[in-house]
Swiss-Prot record:
Name listed for the protein in its UniProt record: UPF0182 protein Tery_4385
Membrane topology summary: Multi-pass membrane protein
Annotated transmembrane regions: 6-26, 52-72, 96-116, 160-180, 198-218, 243-263, 268-288
Cellular compartment(s): Cell membrane
InterPro entries: UPF0182
Lineage per the UniProt record: Bacteria, Bacillati, Cyanobacteriota, Cyanophyceae, Oscillatoriophycideae
Species, as recorded: Trichodesmium erythraeum (strain IMS101)
GO cellular component, one term: extracellular region
UniProt KW Transmembrane keyword: yes
Chief site of localization: membrane
Family membership: Belongs to the UPF0182 family.
A Pfam family reported for this protein in Swiss-Prot or TrEMBL: UPF0182
Length: 919
């Protein structure tokens, strides 16, 4: 009977555990299916296997060690019972009761330790696959890789063991206390005796050994000290704290020896005296000695003493942020611009950005969203060769936002089967404006109509920034494709994305994982059905590579007629010796509070590289992780861990590389650090004599920090135009411009940073000074005031500083928007040069007013791109053939082929309609 009861209890416990773990197990199963579908199964299994290995290992070690200490303590006190529950009905069972309590608590502690250990899989793998850096720290002469890849594991193991031994000590003390082995009546020397004293002494020895190891590692932590003149080890750290940590490590080891030797003594006098002496020496070495050194030796001679350590900080901070290769040039800022100079730089002038992304986004939404469930989330900036001209453009994908579907139409079928994708994009050149103040659109409408030599062959967007719901494709019901007059167009997904849901077992798993019974009972599923999840591209790439940090502003590129998302991925660390974390840098909070930088640089990040670009297909969801920095040791470590994840730099297609751009947020981070770290002289740095800052500008009516901006221009001493990202600098507490920085994005020059410094003795107007001159111009201020009084909202766009050869000019677009409207129109363009400030209807007129030169826009052949042109009879024959193929696929229940044929049929109908209208 007892055996039967035990079996029932055991089965019940197993079922309870299985039920509690079932959701986790099912989720792991669906995750495995997803990783297999996206061809990254090896990454999933590598991570999972190491997590399981560490979890099991930690649980077993913790449980065995803690239970062993409990067992030893109980055996050494087997002559006594636990002094609890006396005088109660449970008194006869108190030993069993306490044993169960200890078993449960030890199990819970072991589970907690295992759960806390399993996330360390990345730390272990980086340790095992570490790639050395090319340099060493200046204090211990250790490779930088030691601090980034090895020391974190050593310190983690030390903390892990300390917690383990300390927990064993506490459990043992509790057992002895409950057994009444600590008697207050004894002399303190005899508080512990015999085998109990031996047990406690050995555990104390283990604790003190680990404390000694901790002091040994603290020596290295001095390289990350933030309490001195600069980040990293200073004079006091090297000459006082370093000695103190050495001394305390030795003292802790001696204390461990004392604890072990006390085993042969019948009292605890030695360990007690040892602990007292240790505490006294700790205060002497760790507190008083460094304080004395700092106050009486360093402070009176701080610059002299700290100078070499300031130099270390400058050198290593520059290395960590990639600022050691900034090429510095002089920029004379001459006032020699004339019409001939502008003609010689037509590539720059014709690509001056007149459209600020903020009012342009409002314009896109008003003119091109078409339906309430479509949304333009952001405006991206890129460049294309259009009809032979290198053009900078702005573009945005039209995404599906299901939450904007009318509430009554928000059904399970519509959410997961019908409204599955966005459609198409809008593109305009940065510098062209129609007579009504609206942008000239190169690509527009639904289906996409192109006026240039760029075609959108696959406009459907299944994966994007707003695709936050899971969907099903390959169902027996059609998906909504796009709206058109009279009726909507429908389609069937024919791409490679999605996880097959072609069995009852898979439907059951996803129904349980997603808590959706409809997956089980819906009659729309077929043998070709697939589920698409992790469709948000930022979430999608993070699922594959959580060890990278991703830029929060993906952008689209039209490559071979397909919409591709490009995301910048960063490798970061907070363990680069002497490198100052971003959050500590001069006025860093100003940029950390703007945009996405705080997310990228969260924590104490003091090393960053943009080593990877990720491309995600908007239709299929396929991901490519391209290596763009082969010299990054952090990335090369991950490449050893996950060799199948990354695509080599040499294998990046040319048409993909043509759309890589220097990341805006990384540029901000580097520019922020350069505000202080352009100073290479330790004395200048100590005195903070030459601090810079980001300039300010006016947007609408508000002052704000100036944002870096992309520009196609010919850099000084360069032969041709290229796509660059630039930002001016001004001195702290002054408004004049002192320098400007450029980051190159094209070809072999990608990633190069250039700094152009103005002559110290020359006044070069900064952006805020130009804004003030605009405000002080009577004609301009009068016109702006007049518009405001007539009920229009005046929007002053970004002020752009445009370097041309060795001169500068300033451009600011002016937009008008009705107070109750959301459609901004570009009405004026302000150009400032030297002492002149002019505002006219167009950039061309403003330049002509100042320089006597008209800017001619590059000729663009306006041709609406549609499917291949055919004569009417050929089209009709093609339509009949496509219709026959559609019907044949429908009769065979081949819904994938049906979707392809029907889409082709509808495209041919549209082409026939346009050709008949044009005739």
């Amino acid at each position: 009977m007892k055996i039967r009861n035990y079996i029932i209890i055991a089965i019940s416990v197993i079922l309870l555990v299985v039920f509690s773990l079932s959701r986790t197990l099912v989720h792991l199963l669906t995750e495995a299916w997803w990783f297999n579908t996206v061809d990254f199964a090896n990454i999933f299994w590598t991570r999972l296997n190491w997590q399981i290995f560490l979890w099991v290992g930690a649980f077993v070690i913790y449980f065995l060690f803690l239970w062993s200490n409990y067992w030893i303590a109980e055996k050494l006190t087997s002559d006594r019972s636990f002094n609890i529950l006396l005088g109660t009905e449970l008194a006869p069972y108190r030993n069993i009761f306490v044993k169960i309590i200890f078993l449960v608590n030890i199990t819970l502690i072991s589970l907690s330790a295992a759960t806390a250990t399993s996330p360390a899989w990345e730390t272990f793998l980086k340790f095992l696959n570490a790639v050395d850096f090319p340099n060493q720290d200046p204090i211990y002469q250790r490779n930088i890789g030691f601090y980034i890849f090895r020391l974190p594991l050593y310190e983690g193991i030390k903390e892990w063991l300390f917690t383990l031994v300390f927990a064993g000590l506490i459990i043992s003390i509790i057992v002895y206390a409950l057994k009444g082995k600590f008697t207050a009546g004894r002399q303190w020397q005899n508080f512990l005796t015999g085998s109990i004293k031996t047990h406690i002494s050995l555990l104390l020895a283990g604790v003190t050994i680990l404390i000694a190891v901790g002091f040994w590692f603290e020596r290295y932590e001095l390289l990350f000290d933030s309490n001195g003149v600069v980040f990293g080890a200073g004079y006091t750290d090297v000459h006082a704290k370093l000695f103190a940590y050495w001394a305390m490590a030795i003292v802790a080891l001696l204390l461990a020896v004392v604890c072990v030797l006390s085993v042969w003594k019948n009292n605890i006098i030695w360990p007690t005296y040892g602990i007292v002496i240790y505490i006294v020496l700790l205060g002497l070495f760790n507190v008083l000695y460094p304080w004395f050194q700092q106050k009486f030796i360093v402070n009176p001679n701080e610059l002299q003493k700290e100078k070499p350590y300031i130099a270390n900080n400058i050198k290593f901070t520059r290395e960590a942020y990639g600022l050691d290769n900034v090429e510095t040039k002089s920029f004379p800022a001459k006032f020699e611009l004339d019409s001939q100079t502008l003609k010689n730089n037509q590539g720059t002038v014709r690509n001056i950005t007149l459209w600020d992304y903020r009012p342009l986004l409002s314009t896109y939404r008003q003119l091109q969203e078409m339906r309430l469930y479509y949304q333009f989330n952001d405006v991206d900036i890129d460049r294309y060769t259009i009809d032979g001209n290198y053009r900078q453009v702005m573009l945005s994908p039209r995404e599906m936002v299901y939450s904007q579907v009318p509430r009554k139409a928000q059904t399970w079928v519509n959410k997961h089967l019908k409204y599955t994708h966005g459609y198409g994009l809008v593109m305009n050149p940065v510098n062209e404006v129609k007579a009504d103040g609206l942008p000239v659109l190169f690509i527009k409408d639904i289906p996409p109509v192109s006026q240039v030599n760029l075609q959108v062959k696959e406009p459907a967007i299944y994966y994007g920034e707003k695709t936050d719901t899971h969907i099903f494709t390959g169902m027996s019901t059609e998906e909504f494709d796009y709206p058109r007059s009279g009726e909507n167009a429908f389609t069937f997904y024919s791409g490679t994305g999605g996880v097959p849901v072609n069995s009852l077992w898979r439907k059951l798993a996803y129904a349980y994982d997603l808590s959706s019974i409809n997956i089980l009972i819906s009659g729309y599923f077929t043998d070709n059905s697939k589920i698409h999840y992790y469709r948000n591209i930022k979430e999608r790439v993070n699922q594959v590579a959580p060890f990278l940090r991703f830029d929060n502003d993906p952008y689209i590129a039209l490559i071979d007629g397909k919409i591709q998302w490009i995301l910048d991925a960063y490798t970061v660390s907070d363990r680069y010796p002497y490198s100052e974390p971003l959050y500590l840098s001069n006025n860093a909070r100003a940029i950390l509070n703007r945009g996405n930088i705080e997310r990228i640089a969260r924590g104490n990040v003091n090393y960053i590289r943009n080593s990877v670009k990720v491309m995600v297909d908007a239709y299929n969801g396929t991901m490519k992780f391209f290596v763009v920095d082969e010299n990054d040791p952090v990335l090369n470590t991950y490449r050893k861990i996950f060799p199948q994840l990354f695509t080599e730099k040499s294998a990046i297609p040319t048409n993909v590389k043509a759309h890589f751009r220097y990341p805006l947020d990384l540029f901000k981070i580097k520019a922020q650090m350069y505000l202080s770290y352009h100073m290479s002289n330790p004395q200048l740095f100590y005195n903070q004599e030459d601090l810079w800052r980001f300039p300010t500008e006016v947007y609408e009516d508000n002052k704000q920090l100036m944002e870096p901006y992309y520009l196609i221009m010919r850099l000084p001493e360069k032969k041709g135009e290229e796509f660059v990202l630039i930002l001016p600098f001004t001195p702290v507490n002054k408004d004049n411009m002192i320098a400007w920085m450029a980051a190159e994005s094209d070809g072999d020059n990608y990633g190069k940073l250039l700094l152009y410094e103005f002559p110290k003795q020359k006044l070069v107007y900064g952006p805020s000074q130009i804004e003030a001159r605009i405000d002080q111009n009577p004609k301009i201020s009068q016109q702006l005031t007049l518009w405001s009084q007539k009920g229009s909202k005046v929007i002053r766009g970004d002020l752009l500083v445009i370097p041309i050869e060795e001169s500068l000019m300033y451009i600011e677009p002016i937009y008008l928007r009705a107070e109750q409207g959301e459609l901004p129109e570009l009405k004026r363009v302000i150009v400032a040069y030297d002492k002149e400030v002019v505002m006219t209807e167009t950039l061309s007129k403003s330049l002509e007013t100042i320089f006597g030169m008209e800017v001619k826009q590059p000729e663009v052949k306006v041709t609406e791109k549609t499917p291949e042109t055919k004569n009417i009879s050929e089209l009709i024959n093609s339509i009949v053939e496509a219709y026959s193929q559609t019907e044949a696929a429908r009769r065979k229940d081949n819904w994938v082929e049906y979707g392809k044929s029907k889409q082709k049929f509808e495209q041919l109908l549209q082409q026939l309609k346009k050709q008949t209208e044009s005739n």
